[in-house]
Each structure stands twice: as C-alpha cells, then as structure tokens.
C-alpha cells in the first residue's frame, strides 16, 4: 500500500524535528516536503536539536527546504502530490499560511495556537474527543492539537468528568524548557530569566481549550511556571467534585481508560496509573514498546500519560500528571490526529 505524501511547515524547531523524526519511517505517511526560512538548504544540513540522532533516512534525504512565505507554496506542495500538511509554525505565520493551504485543498494538522478556538476548526485530542474531527462543507480538513500542558490534566479529567460534576479545577504546572523551543535550552541567560516564572498567557489557553474540548463549565485556578528540566510537563491537580467518590472508585475509573483506535502512534496504555510520584527520569517515555529507545521506529514511546492518584477526600480528587511535552503534547499528538483522519478516510475524499 502506497503511503500518503505529507509535508511539514517549519524545519529547525523542536516540534518540527519531532515531526520529522516521527514521519521518517511512518507506515502510513511519507515525508516528501518541508517548508521553512532556510529555503534551498538540504534538510539534512539543518542543525539537529534533538537528543536522539537524526533518522538515517533523513540524513540521506534530498529534500530541499521550500520557502515558507512563497505565495505559490500550495502549488509547490501539490506538485509533489502532498495531501496532508503538518504545521509546526509559531502562531503568527500559522495564522497567515495554514488557512491558505486549506483553501487550496490541502488537509492541515497544526500544533500552532492560531486557530485552536476558531469555531470552524477542529480542536481534537484523538483519544479524548475524536468525534470533534470534522471538515467544513466542501473544505479540506483543518484540525489543531492542544496546548502541550493540557494532556496531563485532560486525560484524567476527561474520564472523571463523565462520572462526576466538576465544580472547580486547581492546577499548578511545572513545565520543561523544551516547551519554549530549542533557543531556551541553549541560551543560559534566557533560561535563567524563564525558570520559576509564570508563563504569560498559558493559564488562559489551558482553561479555554479544556472548556472547549470537554464542554466543561467550572471555576478555575491555574498557575504555570517553567522549571529547569529539558523535557516533560508535570501538573499537580485538584478536582472539586459535587459527589463523594472514594479513592478506589476514582482509581478504578482512571485505570479503565483504554485504547480507542488502532493507530500507529496510539499506545496500548493511554494512561498509566502509578503509586509513586511521576518521574521524568523513569516515566517520560512511557508507552515505549521496544528497547533500546528509538522513537523513529517506536511511535508509541512517549505517548502514554503517567498519573499518580494522591488522595480523594471530602469531594476533592488530587492527582499528579506527567506527559512528554514535545511528543504526546505536540508532534506526537498532531501525528496521532492525522492518523485518526486517515482511519476516518478523509484522505480518500
């Protein structure tokens, strides 16, 4: 079976390179084009920022970077038989470029925030609200993944909100440096300025995106901060519920969350519940199905959310969630979204 030709918007950022890593050997998708600022440069010559080596197939690739600002970009992509585009662009260029590609008939799956709250654009976490994936009449599909910090909150919350009325959500995040891009990882001055500081606009994004996905109306108390860790977002959460569940009742519900679709990036265990506090060193790559770690081949690695249920007392459910921010919370979530669209036969329409 021939693979679907796909392209990536963005070439050198961490999310773009996670996308490149995940698409290099993907069973359903074939990466044939990348658009960015370094037009004309061979993709293999772009500096690689991930800890894992660049996939060999990309090292030998003859892909040249297309001009991201070319008004004929859609035609350039169509000339390469591209059907789907993965966007790793910042919000401002995404707001200009993504809609043009959709209008030209290309399906766009975006990690950018620009269209997440647009009423005609799908905001989807593939294993939480797959039914929300839709295209406007006569249009190609335009779908967005969420803010990377949502995942360790959303997976437990999506399960519990089906059984309990949530009146208040209190969340405190500890977000890794990679969530702000590779420059923060390598610039000591920027790093010191960011650590332990509130992340502007982050809490507001978390609230509005969760409310849209779950149709949830609750009181919110959310604070976010950057911590001196390379990867992995940890969130401490308290849910105030209008019921009196027991610890065992909540634990049973969290453990009942199962795989929803048989997709290449979908881990067998969507949410691993553990008794100890989640650790980046031990649990960051949960979902991993082969050793040694090779996320180019093992698309499930880093896709499982890790949760410790701390307590259930007086109608307050306390838990800690951990997810890999550049994989599950970004590139992996976007690719999973495209896999869902493939399964739903959008690419055949």
Each model region followed by its residue ranges:
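N-terminal Rossmann-like NAD(P) cofactor-binding subdomain of oxidoreductases
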Residues: 2-198, 219, 327, 335-349
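C-terminal substrate-binding/catalytic lobe of Rossmann-fold NAD(P)-dependent oxidoreductases
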Residues: 5, 14, 18, 25-78, ...
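NAD(P)-dependent Rossmann-like dehydrogenase/reductase catalytic/cofactor-binding core
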Residues: 299-349
């Amino acid at each position: 079976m021939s693979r679907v030709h796909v392209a990536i918007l963005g070439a050198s950022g961490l999310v773009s390179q996670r996308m490149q890593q995940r698409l290099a050997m993907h069973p359903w998708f074939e990466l044939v084009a990348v658009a960015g600022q370094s037009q004309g440069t061979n993709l293999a010559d772009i500096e690689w920022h991930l800890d894992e080596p660049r996939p060999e197939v990309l090292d030998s690739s003859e892909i040249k970077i297309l001009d991201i600002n070319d008004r004929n970009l859609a035609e350039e992509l169509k000339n390469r038989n591209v059907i789907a585009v993965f966007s790793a662009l910042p919000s401002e260029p995404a707001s200009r470029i993504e809609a043009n590609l959709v209008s030209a008939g290309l399906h766009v799956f975006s990690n950018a925030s620009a269209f997440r709250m647009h009423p005609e654009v799908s905001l989807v976490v593939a294993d939480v609200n797959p039914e929300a994936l839709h295209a406007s009449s006569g249009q190609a599909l335009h779908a967005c993944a969420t803010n990377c910090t949502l995942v360790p909150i959303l997976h437990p919350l999506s399960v519990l909100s089906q059984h309990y009325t949530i009146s208040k959500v209190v969340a405190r995040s500890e977000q890794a440096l990679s969530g702000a891009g590779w420059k923060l990882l390598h610039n000591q001055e920027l790093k010191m300025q960011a650590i332990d500081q509130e992340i502007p606009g982050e809490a507001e994004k978390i609230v509005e995106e969760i409310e849209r996905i779950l149709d949830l109306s609750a009181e919110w108390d959310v604070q976010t901060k950057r911590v001196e860790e390379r990867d992995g977002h940890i969130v401490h959460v308290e849910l105030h519920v209008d019921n009196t569940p027991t610890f065992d009742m909540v634990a049973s519900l969290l453990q009942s969350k199962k795989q929803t679709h048989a997709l290449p990036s979908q881990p067998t265990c969507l949410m691993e519940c553990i008794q100890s506090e989640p650790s980046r060193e031990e649990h960051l790559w949960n979902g991993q199905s082969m050793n040694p770690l090779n996320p180019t081949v093992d698309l499930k690695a880093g896709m499982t959310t890790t949760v410790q249920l701390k307590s259930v007392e007086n109608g307050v459910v306390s838990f800690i969630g951990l997810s890999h921010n550049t994989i599950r919370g970004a590139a992996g979530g976007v690719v999973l979204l495209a896999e869902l669209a493939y399964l739903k036969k959008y690419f055949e329409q």
